[in-house]
Amino acid sequence: MLRPLLAAALLAVLALPVGASGSPIVPQLTATVTAKSITLVGADGKRVRVLQPNTYKIVVRDRTKAQNFHLVGPRVNRKTKIAAKTTRTWLLYLQPGSYSYLSDRNKGLSGAFIVAGSPPA
């Protein structure tokens, strides 16, 4: 009875994508905030519009003390401080749903994306 369970667990682990170091690959997104713009891009440099449910490494580059980066969505509510220039790295699981990112000081600086589909196998 234990053998089939162990075999299934081993297959699940082997099915995970891995990098050269042998650890699972975590997709990276980069958020950048300046005094006049806010963006969220994928590894390809293109603005994020649709993502699969997954764990993402989000590097937030807050380049101004005048704005901040605030990400809101299902079970997500993370932000940088307004009065600080900073670079932060967040490891977040993004589940299906609608997400928005904005500056709390200037609502005109905003963007949105959706997470849809099935998590990667």
Model-based region annotation:
Residues L16-P24:
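Bacterial Sec-dependent signal peptides at the C-terminal "C-region" and cleavage site
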Residues M1-L6:
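Bacterial N-terminal signal peptides that target proteins for export
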Residues S23-G42, I82-A121:
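Extracellular/periplasmic metallocenter environments
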